[in-house]
């Protein structure tokens, strides 16, 4: 039986920004949808992060991480910054509101945060699963948590290439004969030409990072 990877989108999961600090003191962060509470006493959760992400190295180095809970009113600029750029060459925290707590950056535009100390890891072929024990947790502001399904179906967001649920074939349904595809995140703009001053609503890059698709 073939595996229909689109079925992953039917799994109920939220969207989070995992943040940590690397061995050089640099703040790192990335968007994940694979975070799960595994126990309540002691309170523990696990998160899966692609090994190529700088955030995975940071969590391994610092032995701690913060999960900021994203809500449905989270801006696409925030998701694009943390989902489609690398902390190795981008200061993701430069233009966002955050506060430091227990040595970790907390996204102030999130609906809440969970701080964990690392207690164990498990390696897969592409991802490291981090098991953390919760040391602090707080609601920042009211808001409906954003689910992975809401991100895809309502916002029409794409998955970063390092996400466990990334599908290389992700594209918009056939419609216009000319479309423009973002070479960073895969967002599809229907129609031609691109509007003047156009920026990708997902990752924020300009029109120069779009390629024309003729069907």
Where are these regions (language model features)?
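Short, non-ligating residues that shape and space the ligands of small metal-coordination modules
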Residues: 191-192, 207-212
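The canonical Cys-X-X-Cys-His
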Residues: 203
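Short linker/helix segments within small regulatory modules
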Residues: 191-199
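Short beta-strand-to-coil "C-cap" segments at the C-terminal boundary of structured domains/repeats
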Residues: 152-153, 211-215
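Basic, polyanion-binding surface patches
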Residues: 1-177, 181-184, 189
């Amino acid at each position: 039986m073939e595996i229909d990877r689109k079925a992953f989108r039917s799994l109920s999961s939220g969207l989070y920004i995992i943040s940590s600090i690397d061995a050089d003191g640099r703040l790192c962060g990335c968007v994940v949808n694979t975070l799960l509470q595994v126990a309540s006493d002691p309170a523990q959760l696990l998160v899966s992060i692609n090994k190529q992400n700088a955030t995975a190295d940071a969590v391994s180095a610092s032995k701690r991480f913060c999960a900021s809970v994203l809500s449905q009113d989270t801006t696409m600029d925030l998701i694009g910054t943390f989902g489609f750029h690398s902390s190795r060459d981008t200061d993701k925290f430069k233009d966002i509101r955050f506060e430091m707590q227990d040595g970790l950056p907390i996204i102030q535009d999130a609906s809440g945060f969970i701080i964990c100390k690392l207690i164990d890891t498990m390696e897969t072929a592409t991802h490291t699963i981090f098991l953390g024990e919760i040391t602090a947790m707080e609601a920042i502001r009211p808001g409906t948590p954003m689910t992975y399904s809401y991100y895809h179906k309502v916002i029409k967001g794409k998955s970063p290439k390092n996400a466990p649920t990334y599908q290389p074939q992700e594209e918009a349904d056939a419609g216009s004969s000319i479309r423009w595809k973002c070479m960073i995140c895969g967002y599809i703009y229907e129609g031609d030409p691109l509007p003047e001053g156009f920026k990708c609503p997902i990752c924020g890059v300009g029109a120069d990072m779009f390629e024309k698709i003729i069907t």
